[in-house]
């Protein structure tokens, strides 16, 4: 993924609800980039350091850590008569039940989305571009990731390895570009499970591509506010057909599968990792081999 260039006035993605914070320090202990500091007895998120991985949100027993929501922004778009396109992350098949998946396109159209397509279409383009990049530089080590939190982690914790990041945009951005190219004036909204996508959308390099980022929970909140019940919607299809293999992209090693590369654990030159501890371990291994005598692609 392309390196993040954040705007000077970066909107915080993760923040502390001060009234709920109870001095337990759990978020401070688990933050992989030490972006949480104690101030006046409160665990405060340092926006410039935060990679929006969401770990602190998960561990906080008081629910004092939260993420910035964009559903109000999308609701305003819809109420002003906008007919945005929706890029839906392929992991919706995990969040929604099988019968809900069949009715989801109709529910989204009832909300006001004019074009509904899976982000997996962008995943195919990202995978092919990544494969081309690797083939053009076979003698170098590569870090291949579409995860904005992982990219930010490299920039914060292993800046010496930043040059190994494959300069390819994520599926969200690739898909957003395709949708904007088709209709430049149309708003594009992304929906998925990842909080870090809210950060990625505001990087300078991605300006004007994604107009709002929703989590699946925010999507459900829009359905609630508009009194739309998925179980009462008709079955319907998305506006575009997805290359089947591209739906594997969110899985560990999914980029490899989509690009047609080996995911065999015995493959000497490809390491597929997930979770910041595994990512850190893989980065440490690369950093310990500055001459790249053991060239690897970390995915």
Name these PLM-found stretches.
Residues 1-25, 254-275:
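A broadly conserved sequence feature marking short terminus-proximal activation segments
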Residues 2-6, 13-17, 22-46, 51, ...:
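Iron-sulfur cluster-binding cysteine motifs and their immediate structural context
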């Amino acid at each position: 993924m392309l390196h993040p260039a954040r705007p000077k006035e970066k909107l915080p993605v993760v923040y502390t609800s001060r009234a709920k914070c109870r001095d337990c320090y759990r978020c401070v202990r688990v933050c992989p980039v030490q972006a949480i500091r104690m101030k006046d007895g409160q665990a405060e998120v340092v926006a410039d350091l935060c990679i929006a991985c969401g770990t602190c949100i998960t561990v906080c027993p008081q629910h004092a850590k939260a993420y910035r929501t964009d559903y109000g922004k999308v609701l305003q778009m819809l109420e002003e008569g906008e007919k945005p396109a929706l890029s839906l992350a392929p992991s919706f098949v995990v969040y929604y039940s099988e019968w809900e998946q069949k009715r989801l396109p109709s529910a989204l159209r009832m909300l006001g989305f004019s074009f509904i397509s899976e982000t997996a279409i962008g995943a195919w383009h990202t995978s092919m571009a990544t494969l081309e990049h690797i083939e053009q530089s076979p003698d170098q080590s590569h870090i291949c990731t579409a995860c904005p939190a992982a990219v930010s982690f490299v920039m914060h914790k292993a800046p010496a390895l930043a040059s190994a990041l494959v300069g390819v945009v994520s599926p969200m951005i690739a898909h957003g570009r395709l949708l904007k190219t088709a209709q430049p004036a149309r708003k594009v909204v992304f929906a998925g499970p990842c909080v870090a996508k809210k950060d990625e959308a505001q990087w300078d390099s991605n300006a004007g591509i994604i107009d709002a980022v929703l989590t699946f929970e925010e999507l459900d909140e829009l359905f609630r506010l508009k009194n739309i019940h998925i179980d009462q919607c008709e079955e319907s299809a998305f506006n575009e057909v997805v290359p089947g293999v591209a739906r594997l992209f969110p899985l560990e090693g999914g980029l490899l599968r989509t690009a047609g590369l080996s995911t065999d654990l015995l493959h000497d030159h490809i390491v597929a990792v997930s979770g910041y501890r595994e990512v850190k371990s893989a980065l440490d291994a690369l950093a310990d081999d500055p001459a790249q005598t053991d060239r690897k692609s970390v995915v």
